[in-house]
Regions:
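An extended acidic
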Residues: 38, 42-114, 200-237
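Aromatic-lined ligand-binding clefts that engage carbohydrates, nucleic acids, or primary amines
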Residues: 746, 770, 778-804, 837
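Extended ligand-binding clefts on enzyme/binding-domain cores
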Residues: 183-241, 347, 371-383, 389-396, ...
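Aromatic-rich carbohydrate-recognition surfaces in CAZymes
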Residues: 298-318, 376-491, 508-522, 526
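Acidic/polar, glycine-enriched structural segments that form the non-catalytic walls/loops
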Residues: 27-38, 128-133, 144-379, 397-400, ...
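Well-ordered alpha-helical scaffold segments within catalytic/enzyme domains
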Residues: 48-53, 73-75, 111, 142-147, ...
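Aromatic-lined, polymer-binding surfaces characteristic
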Residues: 119-120, 340-360, 379, 412, ...
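An acidic-aromatic loop/edge-strand motif
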Residues: 711-733, 824-862
Length: 862
């Protein structure tokens, strides 16, 4: 009997070993993942730096928008200099790169040459169970050097960061300094002017707050603030003992801050050195006109506390990141194979980097995703819907964080429609919907889309928690939305859905499936709340609709794109929630039939979105791939995505909208929707429970929507009442902004000044030259001075003078009017009665516009 047991154990072990060997062999046959762009520093839509090349030395690093955000690293081995990161200095050769690995919290480059192996690791501790750490804007850059030839080597390294990382446009002036924090030293850079949360839009980078490059003085002996190109930089690269201070201010693209020092005298034992890259934005999001702090600042921490904590936690975080990466990658491999795991790691980094965690007035975590490279909207329902699987997987705090600010707005008096909103505004201003008809009318709204999204997501949170308590906070709104889908959901009218680039579509079959599942989810919520009558009503209705759907959408070996369009087809990605939420509304035959059709229909780089075009959506394919929960089906749809990533000619962060025949990007870069890649893990209830149960924060007790301040015109601008200004388009004398200047020879025209088609512009006088100078005398009552702010629309750089004193210098462009207090000198220059306002605006390209007024900003009533 014992011999039989030994034999059984031996056979079991042998089978396991053979399985692992086969798994390893299969992995060996898989080509390495070549990310279109490699994530290096991935925190939020502003602190997001990527390498758009196969090798770290083949291209300069960039912001996700493609604008230069240069990081450079050099190494000197036994007196010979080599590049590790960046293509500059071009006369310094690159150390050969031998490997690249992208993991959920780390990107690891390996280099070899001159008898040493060097790994350069970018660690962003995006640990989802620990929101305190996840929200910290700190990436650790670590060089680890090991000798390979039994010889001793003298190794020095540098890291350089461009001032561009702290500026929206390259010509913005930056100022820099160095500062000690205990045993740490930091080089610091930020814009001279700090327009906090002033700009909104898509192709925008941060120009407030400060970039920090911090290190232990025991590890790095030298620091430099220098010109980006010039002799001082060369001195630092040639002689690491030089310390150079730069005169401030300088243009952002002309500035570098650098640290350097000896790693060690390296033999065969690995030696490491680490620098922290951090960004303190102080305020991150404007929600209903209230500026919110980043979550890590909720208890009063500042940059000093951030850096000290980050330095103290490095070793423990390193271990935690290694453990997290290994465990998550193992779960991804088990769920979908090696290609899926690598795709998941890349998606994980990108998803969290396209949003921001902030604290509400109670210090509770809320988050806002950004619709990168589509229209810049913030808190968009049909963006956080595909993003949601990544947030749902890791627990209720993350899953609720983006719903709370959205639902507070949707349930407020401001949202007057019977369906869910589309968005909260334009990033980083979450001040109310801007898409389509906004709050004004139903033009280009997505009523069934957004309403179905919300009901499904509340159903998913209830599935995770086993109760509907969170839904109870917004029950009246959810009940209203369920009624809307009951009346309008089964056969949608001519309207947009999330795939709005494809245009309006009536009788959308996939949208109908979403509505049906939304109704089923609401029935489940009713059941969990103990309302059995409503639970039966909505569950029965959902089942009846599903049965009708199967009959009316049938088209032979598949189901249609639209009920009234035979011979058409589409991906039915919304069906995944039927199984994840255990609703069982649609028969399994639907998924099987669709999958068989998809597998014979897809192209080289993936399954098209529908029959109308060859383009596809990466996130939706990863959902569609899960429908049958068959591994062969799943891999059949995932493999072309992997091929696309490796072969697309577009070197930018992962797109979710591309052509399936030639792998070219159509649009959409670096969007959070790739969090949808994690949908496959939600089918495994044990895996979902494991990850969700680790939520340490378990947030609750969020504050209601903050009251909007009232903005009252004191000196109206053209958006309310055009006014007459004196203006000139030829450069005047230097005293043009002074109160005693004679502007009688200047022309007179109505505000605003610019060209038709400029976003948000109200044209009173055409201005189409590079520069314009404006003057106007205005009357300001004494009782309005206390809460007085400028009301500005500028495209591009403007200089605003108040009674001859420089009061504001807004840079770049905006797309609408906004309020901004004058600087301290400008406030001091204001007086009761008559005041002279003088403005200069400079234009370089595209639309152009300038207009200025004054408003009184009165706090809203609670």
């Amino acid at each position: 009997m014992k011999e039989n047991n030994r034999l059984a154990v031996f056979v079991t072990v042998l089978v396991a070993v053979l399985f692992l060997f086969q798994l390893h062999a299969a992995g060996q046959d898989i080509p390495p993942l070549r990310p279109p762009a490699v994530p290096l520093v991935t925190h939020d839509p502003y602190f997001s730096i990527w390498s758009p090349a196969d090798k770290l030395t083949d291209a300069d690093t960039v912001h996700w928008t493609g604008k230069p955000h240069r990081l450079t690293s050099l190494v000197r081995i036994d007196g010979k200099a080599f590049r590790l990161m960046g293509k500059d200095p071009a006369d310094v050769p690159a150390l050969p790169q031998t490997n690249l690995e992208v993991l959920p919290t780390r990107t690891i480059y390996t280099f070899e040459g001159e008898g040493v192996r060097l790994t350069l690791t970018f660690m962003t501790p995006a640990l989802p169970d620990d929101l305190e750490v996840l929200s910290r804007p700190v990436t650790y850059v670590t060089w680890t050097v090991q000798g390979l030839d039994q010889k001793t080597h003298d190794v020095w390294t540098t890291l350089e960061a461009s001032g561009e990382i702290a500026a929206n446009v390259p010509n913005q002036e930056v100022v820099s300094m160095t500062k000690d924090y205990g045993d740490l030293t930091a080089a610091i850079v930020g814009c001279r002017e700090q327009p906090v949360l002033e700009k909104k839009g898509d192709d925008i980078r941060i120009d407030w707050g400060h970039l920090f490059m911090a290190f232990r003085r025991a590890d790095f002996k030298t620091i430099a603030l220098s010109a980006a190109d010039g002799e001082k930089r060369k001195i630092f690269q040639d002689d690491f003992t030089s310390r150079v201070e730069l005169q401030n201010p300088v243009p952002a693209n002309s500035f570098l801050m650098s640290v350097g020092g000896q790693v060690s005298t390296v033999e065969n034992r690995p030696v490491s050195r680490t620098v922290m890259l951090a960004y303190d934005d102080k305020f991150s999001i404007q929600y209903m006109k209230k500026n919110l702090r980043p979550y890590w600042r909720r208890n009063g921490d500042d940059a000093a506390a951030l850096l000290k904590k980050a330095a103290a936690d490095y070793e423990s975080l390193k271990k935690r990141c290694e453990q997290f990466d290994a465990e998550l990658m193992a779960d991804l491999r088990k769920a979908g194979g090696e290609k899926y795991a690598r795709l998941g790691a890349l998606a994980y980094r990108q998803c969290f980097a396209a949003g921001k965690f902030v604290a509400d007035a109670n210090g509770k975590p809320i988050s806002f995703c950004k619709e990168n490279h589509s229209n810049g909207c913030i808190g968009t329902s049909d963006v956080f819907y595909p993003m949601a699987p990544q947030f749902l997987l890791f627990g209720p705090t993350l899953a609720k964080s983006f719903l709370v600010p959205f639902m507070n707005y949707a349930a407020s008096e401001r949202w007057k429609f019977p369906f869910a909103p589309h968005d909260l505004g334009t990033y980083p201003h979450a001040n109310g919907q801007v898409y389509g008809g906004g709050e004004r009318n139903e033009r280009d709204q997505m009523p069934v889309e957004e309403t179905g999204n919300l009901l499904i997501l509340f159903g998913a949170i209830a599935q995770m928690e086993g109760n509907a308590d969170f839904a109870g906070l917004y029950w009246a709104t959810l009940e209203k939305w369920a009624g809307y889908l009951k009346a309008k959901g089964f056969d949608p009218e001519n309207q947009l859905c999330t795939d709005d680039f494809a245009g309006h579509l009536a009788h959308n079959v996939n949208l109908s499936a979403k509505a049906i599942i939304g109704l089923g989810a609401f029935g489940k919520l009713c059941d969990l709340r103990g309302d059995k009558a409503k639970a039966v009503e909505y569950s029965k209705l959902a089942k009846e609709f599903a049965a009708r759907w199967v009959k009316e959408a049938a088209d032979g070996d598949h189901f249609r794109l639209a009920f009234d369009r035979p011979g058409t087809w589409s991906q039915k990605y919304n069906l995944i929630w039927d199984r994840i939420l255990d609703l069982n509304l649609f028969p399994a035959e639907v998924a099987r039939k669709e999958m068989e059709f998809y597998r014979k229909t897809q192209n080289t780089y993936g399954l098209p979105l529908d029959n109308r075009k060859d383009y596809t959506k990466l996130d939706w394919i990863t959902w569609t791939a899960t429908l049958t929960q068959n591994r062969a089906d799943f891999e059949a749809l995932i493999d072309p995505i992997y091929k696309f990533l490796n072969e697309t000619p577009n070197r930018s962060p992962m797109t979710d909208w591309y052509e399936t025949k030639n792998a070219k990007k159509v649009g959409f870069t670096a969007r959070p929707v790739v969090g949808g890649v994690f949908a496959q893990l939600l089918y495994d209830k044990a895996v979902w429970k494991k990850w969700a149960s680790r939520d340490k924060t378990k947030a609750s007790g969020w504050v209601p929507i903050p009251p909007m301040p009232e903005i009252k015109a004191v000196v109206p601008a053209a958006d309310r009442q055009p006014a007459l200004w004196r203006y000139a388009m030829e450069k005047p004398t230097d005293d043009w902004a002074k109160t005693g200047f004679d502007d009688a020879a200047w022309k007179e025209g109505k505000s605003g000044f610019g060209t038709e088609g400029t976003p948000g512009a109200v044209i009173g006088t055409v201005w189409n030259t590079p520069d314009i100078w404006l003057r106007r005398e205005v009357e300001i009552p004494a009782d309005k001075l206390k809460n007085l702010e400028l009301w500005i629309h500028h495209d591009e750089d403007a200089e605003i003078y108040i009674n001859g004193v420089a009061g504001a210098h807004p840079k770049g462009y905006v797309s609408d009017y906004f309020n901004r207090p004058p600087n301290a000198a400008g406030i001091a220059a204001l007086k009761p009665g008559k005041n002279l306002i003088a403005v200069h605006c400079h234009q370089t390209g595209g639309g152009q516009y300038i207009d200025v007024g004054f408003v009184e900003v009165v706090a809203g009533e609670k």
